[in-house]
Each structure stands twice: as structure tokens, then as C-alpha cells.
Amino acid sequence: MNQTPDQARPTPRAGIMDIDAYVPGKSAAPAGVAKVYKLSSNENPLGPSPKAIEAAREVAARLDIYPDGTARRLREAIAEVHGLTAQNIICSNGSDEILGLLAQTYLAPGDEAIFTEHAFMVYKIYIQSAGAAPIAVKETDERADIDAMLAAVTPRTKIVFLANPNNPTGTYVPFQEVRRLHAGLPRHVLLVLDAAYAEYVRRNDYEAGIELVRSAENVVMTRTFSKIGLGGARIGWMYAPMHIVDAINRVRGPFNVNATAIEAGIAAIRDRAHVERSVTHNETWLTWLSQEMTGLGLRVTPSVGNFLLIHFPDDQKHSAAAADDYLTARGYILRRVSGYGFPNALRMTVGTEEANRGVVAALTTFLKS
């Protein structure tokens, strides 16, 4: 059978190879580095709740049994803690799975979806995967600009993604502004509030989105267990109106949350003492790191997350790339963020006291060199 070169093997549909693959933060230092401090992925420096660890151990003997495909007990635990209705919750293999399912379900070729220019990179990936057009809106002072987002809405707009707080900047939108964004959207446009870092925010003008979801038919809120110590378990969840829950349940995998994740998640979200310890640790060291970095002459974007965006001088000797190489050689792994539009900045997760002090000491020496 004669074939043209294009027919010699399966090929992805149009547009797939135009997608830039997501590259996670690195996790290894060069060979010979005695101790590695991974500060590149916004993980919880206190680790998992001891109760979650024990719950994961207990389920090990039952791993031959499929998990509950609805994750009912996990949904009930989430509902109990947050004062929600369990039937309005869907659990997922990380919150990014939910983001992908929303794009898959509500976008089609020819549609548009909006996000801000420095937002979580997976939005663009999932929008393109659905065959839709990604529309990146300029930010103002590294914050979402609500007027600019509303101005970007066209008859083709179907989804607006808002990371609140945003990664990698750590900035947030006061909830009155979120409500203004929602009020300005056509009712058929879905507003996705990605509140992955909500646990860490202690501001009177911030809300994760629960009340807006309750009162609207076109708003969902997504959350994650990663920031409370279960990044490796991959647990996300969405709170949404029932008509959206129904649609997503039709396309999600039948056993998308595994048995270990379900049991660990139930224990973790009910261990409020561990969550509060995590938040207190973060508040203390986020403030300290911000002050120390500023004292070194580095600009820091004000953050309410569990990380800092640190901006470096323009001179090549003390650039972000040079700083990253210097820190990595000493076992401190930070995140380069060129792909987010910050070629001369590094994102640093708030770590343990030892890690935080070590990075500041290393940068002090680096900047004097």
C-alpha cells in the first residue's frame, strides 16, 4: 500500500503540536550536593498531616479493591469542613484535572477563553487542547486587571479563568472586584475561580468564591489538597452548580481519585490543627523572607500565597539565571519563571526555617560577589 509521508504514522489533530508542554519545577541538585532543599513547587514544608499518613497506611491492605467512584466520603468531609453541600462537589486527580475537564466540556473550536498574562500555565494548555483560542489579558502591577478582562470578552468567549490568588505572582483580587467581574460577564460565560492557595490568605477583603457559586449559575470554584501537604496524592475538588456537576460527571474518569488519596484526604482536611500550623508557619516566614529579600535590594511581588516572586538586577552577573545556578549548586532548588513572562525572576516556596535562612544567606553572598 502506497502512503504519503503524512500517512506513515498516526498524527495528532490540528493544533496539538502547537501546545507548549508544561514543565514542572526541578527537584534535583547536581551530583555531590549533600542536602537538597526543594523550594520549586509550592509544597507544604511541614509535610502531610500525621493523621493522613496513618490513613494512607491503613488502606494499603485493601488496594485490590476499586475506590468509590464518587469519592462520597471525601466529598462529605470537604462539605463538613467548609459548610457546603456534598452533592455540589466533585473530587479529582489534582485540581488541574478539573480545569481540563471544564475546558473539554465547555469549549469547542472557534471559542475563546480568557486568563491573565501571568496566570497558571495549564489554562492555556487546556484551552488549546479543546481547540479553542487562548486570550491572555495584560495585568496591572502584576495583578489581574478586571477592566481589561471585561474588555477582552467577545461573543466567542465561553470561559474566564481567574487564579485568585495567582501563581506565580502571589497577588490576589479583592472579592468586590471578583463580583464586578462576574456582573460584567454574559450569563452563558463560565467564570472559573481557581482558589488553590485560599487556605493561606488572611485578608478581610478576600473570599475563595463559595458565596458566589451559591448565588450564580455560571461560577465554579476549584481547590486543592496540595497546599495542605498532599501534593503527591493528587487531590483536587470543585464546588459548582448542579448542572455543571452533572456535565463534568459525564466526562470524568470513573475512578479518578484513588483509594489512598480518598482516605488520606479525609484525614487531612479534618485535621484542622495541622492546617492551622501550616498557615501560621507560612505567615511567619513569608513576612520574614519578604523583609530579608527587600533588605538585599531585591524587589519582591507582595504575596498572599506560600511563595514569593523575587526579581533580580538587570546585570548579567546577578541575574535570576545566575542566582538560580548559584543556589542550585548549593542545594537550594527554586523555580525559574521565564515561561510565565518573568525572565529575570525566581519563585521561591516558603520552606522550613533551615531552608529559608539558607537561601537568604546564600543570596547575600551571591549578591556581594
Swiss-Prot record:
It catalyses: L-histidinol phosphate + 2-oxoglutarate = 3-(imidazol-4-yl)-2-oxopropyl phosphate + L-glutamate. Keywords: Amino-acid biosynthesis, Aminotransferase, Histidine biosynthesis, Pyridoxal phosphate, Transferase. GO terms for biological process: L-histidine biosynthetic process. It is an enzyme of class 2 (transferase). Pathway: Amino-acid biosynthesis; L-histidine biosynthesis; L-histidine from 5-phospho-alpha-D-ribose 1-diphosphate: step 7/9. InterPro entries: Aminotransferase_I/II_large, HisP_aminotrans, HistidinolP_aminotransfase, PyrdxlP-dep_Trfase, PyrdxlP-dep_Trfase_major, PyrdxlP-dep_Trfase_small. Its cofactor is pyridoxal 5'-phosphate. It holds the Pfam family Aminotran_1_2. The modification N6-(pyridoxal phosphate)lysine is found at residue 227. The keyword Transferase applies. Its EC number is 2.6.1.9. SUPFAM superfamilies: PLP-dependent transferases. GO terms for molecular function: histidinol-phosphate transaminase activity; pyridoxal phosphate binding. Homodimer. Belongs to the class-II pyridoxal-phosphate-dependent aminotransferase family. Histidinol-phosphate aminotransferase subfamily. HAMAP family: HisC_aminotrans_2. This is Histidinol-phosphate aminotransferase 2. It comes from Mesorhizobium japonicum (strain LMG 29417 / CECT 9101 / MAFF 303099) (Mesorhizobium loti (strain MAFF 303099)). The lineage of its organism: Bacteria, Pseudomonadati, Pseudomonadota, Alphaproteobacteria, Hyphomicrobiales.
